[in-house]
């Protein structure tokens, strides 16, 4: 959306795109509690945390909020794995790039040892574990997940060198129940399941979005309630519909988005009535 159209609605940015600033993301109580546990327990003790849920229920928002908060913690190193489906050799290369450790692709033991030494030095100098975020973790091969488990612990599993936050859909939960991954699944210390939101939660998020964007009265109260009632508990669906409404309103130069506009955009077209066949044959 261009600057002219944003000015028409008194907006600093389009509040319904995925690229909204982190401060525009609404942290409800359960999410706040999860972030607090990561910030005050996991990064100091290490281990695995798991974020799981269906698409559109808030996994990406959780990762963004958590990454932003941990990025403000002094002396902590935070990295994110961007290629979760990579094979083991590429997995090591990316870890080396994230944590600044030169790795030899043909000497996995050298990479294993150097990464652990880097993390151990970080722990001893800061008393906190580095953090690794892995989104779409359901795409990771089982051998890579097991290698990550072995990488992150020492002294017969009594000392943890890294904090890992895995995020994925329900396939990740199913994957962690497989026999070869039970040792990893049993080490998940903190779990957070993003659930379908109530209409009240959606309303809180919607109000927060448009207020942070600069125009709390962008939508009529009736339209906001209608959006929340028809979003199926899904934040992504709500924002997609709201974005469509904003684009349509801008095209029509409407100053406020209202319920009438909603029915114009999302009215279900009525199928034409079928004509009844004429009974009887041809007259001779």
Model-derived features with residue positions:
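Conserved NTP-binding/hydrolysis module of P-loop NTPases
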Residues: 11-18, 86-105
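Walker A/P-loop nucleotide-binding motif
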Residues: 44-65
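AAA+/P-loop NTPase substrate/partner-engagement loops
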Residues: 69-97
